[in-house]
Amino acid sequence: MALRKIRTYEDEILRKKSKVVEKFDQRLCQLLDDMKDTMYEANGIGLAAPQVGVLKRAVVIDIGEGAIELVNPEIEQVEGSAVDVEGCLSVPNVWGEVERPQKVVVKAQDRFGNEFRLEAEGLLARAVCHEIDHLDGILFVDKVIRFVSEEEIEQRRSRGDKMDLE
């Protein structure tokens, strides 16, 4: 396993649409493992393949309940909405309030190509939507309602608020 370089907002790859994964092989497994290692090393809660320079529809997420791998994810259902603060490993030291669905149902495949559905709500739903946006060349700053200062982030952290600060 290896750490991969996280691309930042200046990199054009982050604005491109990712391709569907068609080969479920050792290279995909290696990519997913490397993405998890990279995400954990960077103290993130999610990482999409384009963020490590790979235009494939694959994401990893861990909001503290164990890693989830989503290959070729598609949002099938959304319910409700909520505004909360997000950040992104590809847009360092920038945070903002973003409106996202409160609940989502996602159809995806695992690393072996097996299809499954994931029902997510709250922070997990937010992280899933944020990462799927990356697969379509969308950054959270494109959806920010209000940018948030570092001081406000520190206040929220000191209260123990869970935020998608990737």
Curated annotation (Swiss-Prot):
Pfam families: Pep_deformylase (PF01327). Its EC number is 3.5.1.88. It catalyses: N-terminal N-formyl-L-methionyl-[peptide] + H2O = N-terminal L-methionyl-[peptide] + formate. InterPro entries: Peptide_deformylase (IPR023635), Peptide_deformylase_sf (IPR036821). The active site is at residue 131. GO terms for molecular function: metal ion binding; peptide deformylase activity. Binds 1 Fe(2+) ion. Its cofactor is Fe(2+). One of its GO terms (biological process) is translation. Fe cation binds at residues 88, 130, 134. It is an enzyme of class 3 (hydrolase). Keywords: Hydrolase, Iron, Metal-binding, Protein biosynthesis. Belongs to the polypeptide deformylase family. Removes the formyl group from the N-terminal Met of newly synthesized proteins. Requires at least a dipeptide for an efficient rate of reaction. N-terminal L-methionine is a prerequisite for activity but the enzyme has broad specificity at other positions. This is Peptide deformylase. It comes from Caldicellulosiruptor bescii (strain ATCC BAA-1888 / DSM 6725 / KCTC 15123 / Z-1320) (Anaerocellum thermophilum). The gene is def.
